[in-house]
Amino acid sequence: MKKIFILTGEASGDKLASKVISKLQKINSNLEYLSVGGDNLKSLGIKSIYDLKEITYLGFTKVILNIITINKKINETVNAIIKYNPDLLFTVDSPDFTLRVAERVKKINPKIKTIHYVAPQVLSLIHISEP
């Protein structure tokens, strides 16, 4: 059975990941998952190694005040991924967190496959013409 570790860093990433994984579960039921996720992934039956709320800090000041906790969670996450030994590390959004973790994992296990997924951004241009 192939294993996928899903790594999100905030609620929006959890929501995006759950949409992808719910489709994947319909296509292939022979996949095993572990995550850092929230309620959306949990609703799909996917266990999270800790609650996503433990790493969600809004604003520069909150991040600075919690930098030690954040670094501990990064180390905890890297160790959990290495121990789980997934076939794929699926990172979603939150590049400051997810890509930092992925980089550390790749240093320990350079053969691990990774995919980083982000929501498409829409750029709206309004053309104002003069009469």
Segment roles from a protein language model:
Residues 3-129:
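Active-site and donor-binding regions of nucleotide-sugar-utilizing enzymes
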